[in-house]
Amino acid sequence: MTTTLQQRSSANVWERFCTWITSTENRIYVGWFGVLMIPTLLAATVCFIIAFVAAPPVDIDGIREPVAGSLIYGNNIISGAVVPSSNAIGLHFYPIWEAASLDEWLYNGGPYQLVVFHFLIGCACYLGRQWELSYRLGMRPWICVAYSAPLASATAVFLIYPIGQGSFSDGMPLGISGTFNFMIVFQAEHNILMHPFHMLGVAGVFGGSLFSAMHGSLVTSSLVRETTEVESQNYGYKFGQEEETYNIVAAHGYFGRLIFQYASFNNSRQLHFFLAAWPVIGIWFTALGVSTMAFNLNGFNFNQSIIDSQGRVINTWADIINRANLGMEVMHERNAHNFPLDLAAGEVAPVALTAPAING
């Protein structure tokens, strides 16, 4: 009798737990994806804060030249970062228990892997949680599809790119100036500015900003007047009201006359789908571009494309960019290379075997 009651009681506890996890009445929805998302994001956040503030220098290039990234080692908010794990570790999984000591784990940049792996798992679960909540509420599932763009970007720079380059030391540092350094080195090694997928991403981000500003300003300029001049116009809207709060016909008429008729949407659903799809598709392409450049399928190379009748090179902007790329490449990881491969791979210059006679 006791055993039966105990089993029934434990079953009731599990059922109550399942009901609470999947309840849409909670102030913040947890969901089954949230069961994994919450601890992973908490672990990533706590480790990031501790490492950003107090982590010792990391031997990022694997040449016994540690690079300091934390605040207590002299950095500020802009220059500080969680430094990527050492090139000596490469692509090896490097949890705490794989190191001989905690000092070794810190010296080889173990916190970077801990933060990145937990962060990516947590972000993937956040996407799943968006789908799960949409499903519970009977909504369409496109919110998580839109979120897949920044998730794909994070996965590209933190996981796919290091895999393609053969080491997590090539991943993006977790800091402001570290992000800029990653971008500069990426341009130097892969010529990303000349990659069509990056161009589509630029069009997506800048175009999305433009369309967002256009939409917001048009809506704000065509609000239906519900208040007096001494009241805020925001009081003219009541949450959940059935009436339109702005006049889409007026907005359509204005923009159609400003540009031309068919440049303006006359269907609100088409308009908002476009506003979501444009930046998402652009960022998808950029993430795909980074993922292909990870395996050295780089941007277009138009260096020395124009030659005159005498065989002399006529420089174009492509050659200017190439010279900048070479300059950036020889400056990064300055002590890790005997000679940059891109410079060493050029044509061999003739060398005189005998010194010319100098009549003096």
Curated annotation (Swiss-Prot):
GO cellular component: photosystem II; plasma membrane-derived thylakoid membrane
A Pfam family recorded for this sequence: Photo_RC
Class of enzymatic activity (EC top level): oxidoreductase
InterPro entries: D1/D2 (IPR055266), Photo_II_D1/D2_sf (IPR036854), Photo_RC_L/M (IPR000484), Photo_RC_L/M_CS (IPR055265), PSII_D1 (IPR005867)
Disulfide bonds: none
Annotated site (Stabilizes free radical intermediate): H190
Residues bound to pheophytin a: Y126
Reaction catalyzed: 2 a plastoquinone + 4 hnu + 2 H2O = 2 a plastoquinol + O2
Residues engaged in binding chlorophyll a PD1: H198
Site (described: Tyrosine radical intermediate): Y161
Enzyme Commission designation: 1.10.3.9
UniProt propeptide residues: 345-360
Changes after translation: Tyr-161 forms a radical intermediate that is referred to as redox-active TyrZ, YZ or Y-Z. C-terminally processed by CtpA; processing is essential to allow assembly of the oxygen-evolving complex and thus photosynthetic growth.
Job of this protein: Photosystem II (PSII) is a light-driven water:plastoquinone oxidoreductase that uses light energy to abstract electrons from H(2)O, generating O(2) and a proton gradient subsequently used for ATP formation. It consists of a core antenna complex that captures photons, and an electron transfer chain that converts photonic excitation into a charge separation. The D1/D2 (PsbA/PsbD) reaction center heterodimer binds P680, the primary electron donor of PSII as well as several subsequent electron acceptors.
Similarity section: Belongs to the reaction center PufL/M/PsbA/D family.
Record text on subunit structure and interactions: PSII is composed of 1 copy each of membrane proteins PsbA, PsbB, PsbC, PsbD, PsbE, PsbF, PsbH, PsbI, PsbJ, PsbK, PsbL, PsbM, PsbT, PsbX, PsbY, PsbZ, Psb30/Ycf12, peripheral proteins PsbO, CyanoQ (PsbQ), PsbU, PsbV and a large number of cofactors. It forms dimeric complexes.
Protein's name according to its UniProt entry: Photosystem II protein D1 3
Organism name: Trichormus variabilis (strain ATCC 29413 / PCC 7937)
The organism's taxonomic lineage, starting at the top: Bacteria, Bacillati, Cyanobacteriota, Cyanophyceae, Nostocales
Gene: psbA3
